[in-house]
Amino acid sequence: MKQPYNHGVLFYHEHSGLKDIHNGIGEVAKSLSSMCKHLSLQLSENKGDIIKYCKSIKNENYSSDVDVLFILGGDGTLNELVNGVMQYQLNLPIGVIPGGTFNDFTKTLQLHPNFKTASEQLLTSHAESYDVLKVNDLYVLNFVGLGLIVQNAENVQDGSKDIFGKFSYIRSTVKTLLNPVKFDFSLTVDGETKEGNTSMMLIANGPNIGGGQIPLTDLSPQDGRANTFVFNDQTLNILNDILKKRDSMNWNEITQGIDHISGKHITLSTNPSMKVDIDGEINLETPIEIQVLPKAIQLLTATEQNN
């Protein structure tokens, strides 16, 4: 088999979510070495390291022949690589291997949730261009959330998602829903302004959020548009019932309680100022400005999901 790439770099964290990271790296490397003449394994020890490595690749200090990047981790780790690639304008395809607590975007790429199977799928994958959301000075691949989404993330203690799995996350979500924090908002999408009061807002680029799929056939991370969802009180009551049953988010039951607005340019201010979750990382506060960057990044996409 001819290797399509010269030099690939696989980024990973020691605390990526895999029980045995070194054994996992070995399994992944078997597949990736079939794709690349040269494969470098690059440990990211601290937050921000991946962005620094992207700068080094851009300046050719890392190597002059890197032509593909791989990331082993969850949505937060992928977000760091996306920011490095966008910030330093690296026109390189990215192969994503699930290895964290949440791997929503790998579903969009039709990749299997098992890291070994997903790395094997990359052998027959192809590069496709996907939209990126620019949120103030940061870049987002999957979603922007505020209100209950941030509340819930802060209620889950560090590491508990790995130790107790889905149950701990759902228990925290129910606790959050019983004590929602409401806020006033002013939302402008492509020049049209909406004002109101809510306790949860979501701006989605990808169709998979929080382990569930948003049931909109026209929602695509390749259409040049972002989708804003404003949740009302009725929706939150249904969400609470669903989560108490420990089921996945059932969008079909709650869509009647959601305002949906699609557009290319979004500004959002709130009172009071609210923390903002971007792909699982709480890095911003309102006000925010969001611009859709059409087909700004290349991601390796499987032909079909391997179940």
UniProtKB/Swiss-Prot annotation:
Q: Which cofactor does it need?
A: Mg(2+)
Which InterPro entries would you find in this protein's record?
ATP-NAD_kinase_N (IPR017438), Diacylglycerol/lipid_kinase (IPR005218), Diacylglycerol_kinase_cat_dom (IPR001206), Lipid_Phosphate_FormReg (IPR050187), NAD/diacylglycerol_kinase_sf (IPR016064), YegS/DAGK_C (IPR045540)
Q: Where is the DAGKc domain?
A: 3-139
- Example GO biological process: phospholipid biosynthetic process
**EC id:** 2.7.1.-
Output the superkingdom of the source species.
Answer: Bacteria
Q: How is the cofactor bound?
A: Binds 1 Mg(2+) ion per subunit. This ion appears to have a structural role and is required for catalytic activity.
| Pfam families membership | DAGK_cat, YegS_C
Where, by residue number, does ATP bind?
S44, G74, D75, G76, T77, L78, N79, E80, T101
Active-site residues, as the UniProt record annotates them: E281 (proton acceptor)
Q: Where does Mg(2+) bind?
A: S220, D223, R225
Instruction: Show the SUPFAM superfamilies listed in the entry.
Output: NAD kinase/diacylglycerol kinase-like
Mention any one GO cellular component term assigned to this protein in its UniProt record.
Answer: plasma membrane
Q: Does the keyword Phosphoprotein apply?
A: no
Its keywords, alphabetically, are: ATP-binding, Kinase, Lipid biosynthesis, Lipid metabolism, Magnesium, Metal-binding, Nucleotide-binding, Phospholipid biosynthesis, Phospholipid metabolism, Transferase
**Keyword flag Lipid biosynthesis:** yes
Q: Which GO terms describe its molecular function?
A: ATP binding; ATP-dependent diacylglycerol kinase activity; metal ion binding
Q: What does this protein do?
A: May catalyze the ATP-dependent phosphorylation of lipids other than diacylglycerol (DAG).
Per the similarity annotation, which family is this? Belongs to the diacylglycerol/lipid kinase family.
Database matches in PANTHER family? LIPID KINASE YEGS, SPHINGOSINE KINASE
Specify the protein name: Putative lipid kinase SE_0507
In its UniProt entry, the species of origin is given as Staphylococcus epidermidis (strain ATCC 12228 / FDA PCI 1200)
Q: What is the lineage of its organism?
A: Bacteria, Bacillati, Bacillota, Bacilli, Bacillales
